[in-house]
């Protein structure tokens, strides 16, 4: 049974492509006709491609891996954020950080900085700083959160990218291609589908079009997550789950309170120095 259908896609306006003069010839296999100078996408092919992508996404979710959703265009940002959150997946809806994938360790370092700042807030270190210093660090935290907050739980490279408008997000696509990360993409008639592993031919400018496609794909991912959870419960019931190993004792001696306060103060000073140099 299909994840979506012709009528649903038609009602959402998924069939509207771009002006003929803006088309990319590589999208010819997915174009049904031209009407009033505008290309019309073959929605029968869109249905098939949505099903293909949804099944692959389901298997990724079932395996416990992450899919990174990318959409920085205004029409898609909010809906992508909502759908990604519904399946507990990371997403980028602000500016794509250059090197997000190809220089992932640096991005992780910035994410960890947010966690460190949060710790300074909770452990009382802030009380030893001036209002100006607290404001500087808080601004750093807000700036980091805006661009990286939605990927805070991404501890390793994603197993796939789901991109809205592959032409606008060309840097993200290139980074994924370079690392061999599969790319799922909603591809309009003005875009090049060549480097997209799972092409979903559809209108990528209308919010409703993006929403109905994400609905189908995320529903499949939810199924995958539920199947993973059910299999885990069955394994535990059958006694096949690996025994919980005791936590390894840390080789480092525990820091006493004064040492920890000194380290946190040093971290706060480092953040302030970075802010002044920026």
Name every feature range the model reports, one short phrase each.
Residues 1-3, 226-278:
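Intrinsically disordered, compositionally biased charged tails
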